[in-house]
Structure formats: C-alpha cells, structure tokens
Amino acid sequence: MPQEINLPLILIAALLASVSPGPATLAIAGTSMASGKGSGLALASGITAGSFVWSISAVFGLGAIMLANVWMFEVVRYFGAAYLMYLAFKAARSAISQKEIAVKSITGCKSALFTKGLLLHITNPKAILFFSSLYSLGVPAGATIGQLTLVILAVGIHSFFIFHGYAFLFSSKTMTTLYLRLRRWFEGAFAIGFGVASVKILGAKLL
C-alpha cells in the first residue's frame, strides 16, 4: 500500500459514518425486517452502488464543483429532502394503519428496491461532501490513478460488507418476529427518523 495514502484513517472514518443511524441504515432495517433478506440485500446493493457513485465523483472533484456552483448543491439537497419526506410519509401511514401484515406480503421487485437504494444515497448531498472531506484527510494531492483506484475499491468493498451485513442482521428470524409484533412502533420510529433526516438535509450548508 502506498505510504502516502492513509487508508486506515479513511476506512475508520467511513466505518463510523456507516454504523451511525441514518437514512440508509433505517431503510435497510425496515425493508429487511418487513420483506426479508432478499429485498434487504437488493436495497443494500443500490445503496452500495450509490456509495461508489459518490466516491468516484469525489475523486474527480465534484465536491469542489458544488462549492463553486451552489445551485447544484441546492438541487440535490431539495430532491434528497423530498425523497426522505416521502419515505417518512409512507412509514407514518403504515404506523397508523391497524391492518396486520405478513412478511411475505410486502415483497417487491428487486430492481425497484435497488433503484430505491441508489436514489436514497445519491440524493443525499451530504454524501459527496463527506467523501470529499474523507479523501482530503487521507489522500495526497498528487495521488496517482492507481492510488485513487485503491481507495475507491477499499471504500466500496467496505460499504458493501457494512450495508449487506445490516440486511442479514435485520432479516433474521428474531428480528422479523419482533417486527411483526411491534410493527407500528417500528414504522413510527422510521417515520421520525426519515423526517428528521429530511429536515437536516434541508438545513445543510456547504460551509
């Protein structure tokens, strides 16, 4: 590993960001408990793809471009906030509903879930700023293409295991049973979580 790259620092920072509660974690948890492992993995794959998109974009300086063109940040910010608010509304409606559901009745198209995960990640403007900051900490200005590729792959593989691990964890029989028993409470918590995330994105600043 090239000594100029502080890969451990990058991966530790990425780990802390991945394990902290956020839109991606909430979405994977809710989908995995309600619809099963397959659906959770499909969603996690979309979120991982989104991580690759932002990671590559950060390498090519999209964060700096956003800083120079505020309107780009604003467009992504409002789209991201609107999408999270939509997810909050769906979760709130499910929490209010007293209709009992079965796990297998919520199965959805895997490609649609992949797209949902991708949109969830690429409409969060904080992600590109996070990756830009992350790379500024551990990647030297004169890094070669090979070094940048190493970082992108390392962070991408790291994200893959974290997000897919969540899908396996929350789709376990214990978690599924718990979800069915406390579905309305879970959905209420998801609604609040997505709502708070939406408000935070609306209040996000470039500097």
Task: List each language-model region with its residue ranges.
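Juxtamembrane cytosolic amphipathic helices that cap and anchor the N-termini
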Residues: 5, 108-113, 122-126
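Membrane helix-loop-helix hairpins that form the core translocation module of multi-pass transporters
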Residues: 38-113, 199
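Core segments of transmembrane alpha-helices
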Residues: 120-133, 191-194
